[in-house]
């Protein structure tokens, strides 16, 4: 049996990007976006869960929401880098989707996740 879950959260945060080209994104600005975390396992924990939704929310939303991402994260806070950070930050997370704004979406997928992707959400 494979168990999957997803947790979607709204995130409001500011950042500026360090880029190799001229861009208005190099100036401090904010986003009201959305993050979805996907987790899976073939063995539920002792409480009968993949992972507690509150744990995911506390770790991601509680850390990033209304924060300055440049101060909170040790990397250039692009949507792609944030998605990768989430995958590495949450146990059993195999995919993270970061919607920085309408139409702008980045995703990171753990290509070494031990469950066959065809069984995942």
Predicted regions and their residues:
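Charge-rich, low-complexity N-terminal segments
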Residues: 1-121
């Amino acid at each position: 049996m494979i168990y999957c879950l997803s947790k979607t959260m709204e995130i409001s945060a500011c950042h500026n990007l360090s880029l190799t080209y001229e861009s208005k994104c190099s100036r401090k600005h904010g986003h009201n976006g959305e993050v979805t975390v996907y987790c899976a396992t073939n063995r539920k924990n002792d409480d009968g869960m993949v992972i507690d939704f509150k744990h995911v929310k506390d770790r991601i939303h509680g850390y990033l929401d209304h924060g300055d991402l440049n101060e909170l994260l040790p990397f250039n806070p692009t949507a792609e880098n944030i998605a990768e950070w989430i995958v590495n930050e949450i146990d059993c997370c195999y995919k993270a989707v970061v919607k920085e704004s309408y139409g702008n979406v980045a995703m990171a997928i753990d290509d070494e996740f031990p469950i066959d992707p065809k069984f995942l959400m």
